[in-house]
Structure formats: C-alpha cells, structure tokens
Amino acid sequence: MKDGPHIVRIAALIGDRARADILTALMGGQALTATELAGVAAVSKATASAHLTKLVEGKLLAVESQGRHRYFRLADEDVAALLESLMGVAYRAGALRLKSSPREPAMRKARVCYDHLAGNLGVMAFERFQQRRFLRHGDGGLQLTPAGERFVAGLGIDPAAHRGTRRPACRLCLDWSERRHHLAGSIGAAMLDRIYALGWAKRERDSRVVRFSASGERDFRDVLDR
C-alpha cells in the first residue's frame, strides 16, 4: 500500500550535500542571506540561489525581504525537529564529518535547536520537568501542569501568553547528541530567552553553542532542583 504523504521529494531536498549544509546552518534560528548561505555550503551564489528556490518551494524554508536583501530561515519548528531527528540517526549510523570540530564538546553540552535549548543541559532540564511533574499529555498534546505554570511564572514567563496560540506551548524534540528528548515549543523558546536575560549563558557568535558561565550553570541547575 502507498498511502499517506509522498516523502521522496522532501528526502531528495534534504539529501543534497549543499542543501543539507544550508539547512543545518539555519538550525540556530537566525535568518541568513543567500550570500551567507553560499559561503556555508561552499557553492557559488547562483548555485545557492537555485538550492534556496527548491527549499522554499518544498516548504522547508521561508523567505523574508527587507529592502534589497532576502533572508532565509527554517519554515517552522516541524522542520527543525525533522533535522534534529535526522542528525540523531546520522550520529548513530556513524555518518560523522571527517574533521572533528573543537566546538563539538560544547555543542553536545548546550546549543540552540531552532530557538530552544538542546544538548546535555537541555535534556537535563526536560527530565527535571518530568520528575517534578511540570508536564502532562493532554488532548492537545504536551501541556504544563499547574505546578509547571507556577514554575515558569517564577522564572518570569507568563504561562497565559502561551495558551491557545498557533504554536504549541510544549512539545518534544529528539536530541541528536543525547538521544533523548528536550523541550521545544513556545515555552522552550521562552526559557532560553530567560536564560540569556538572567545572564546565565550567552550564545557564541556564528555558532549554535550556548556557553553557560560556571555560576550560570549552577543557578540553572539549582532552580530546576528546588
């Protein structure tokens, strides 16, 4: 039987090396120009433009024009979750890049996945949410419990602002390096914003790495363990 959506087109779009590099570069949640993405993929501007057109037509990317420039980003969080899952499959299959980056340990510890925290610390936070019963599975998917709402409110996040919106407040995202889930959705994004605002961590320039200070990591762990 051949029921359901046809996945070949999407698989073919992701399966090209240059397009895969472009998609991976956008996993940090930032919008980039065609020129910047051409550099990332090590292709000419004309070739990058052709790839970007295909990715936009395939609904994997969205484009926004500002003046003379066009900025490309991942279409939505579903695309980011798909890419993160594929990275996990590639990692388990041993499909690794030949050159190990000095940033790899830092990437595995804490990084941006679209707009939320991933890596060891992201998974740790999600597991604390589960242990403290901050989450439950309802008819609309993963939701904050009353205890979870009180917790995020204590961090300075208004839970009411995340109810009834188009984007899910909470959702699972499979972490490629930890092979377990971290917290995505608008609450996951708001938590990462608060981590920055509280001065616990900063994002490295031109990287997905989220670098916690020693005191920031201690405070982050403490607030999750209270």
Predicted regions: what they are:
Residues 125-126, 135-151:
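Non-catalytic interaction/regulatory modules that flank or connect domains
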Residues 1-5, 28, 81-137, 158-206:
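Amphipathic alpha-helical dimerization/coiled-coil segments
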Residues 34-61:
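Canonical helix-turn-helix DNA-binding module
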Residues 13-19, 76-77, 107, 119:
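Short helix-coil-helix linker/hinge
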Residues 5-44, 70-72, 112-113:
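N-terminal helix-turn-helix DNA-binding core of bacterial DNA-binding proteins
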Residues 31, 54, 59-60, 71, ...:
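Short hinge/loop at the helix->beta-strand junction immediately C-terminal to the helix-turn-helix recognition helix
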Residues 56-66, 73, 138-139, 204-205:
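Beta-hairpin "wing" of winged helix-turn-helix
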Residues 64-92, 144, 148-151, 216:
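Basic, amphipathic "hinge/linker" alpha-helix immediately C-terminal to the N-terminal HTH DNA-binding motif
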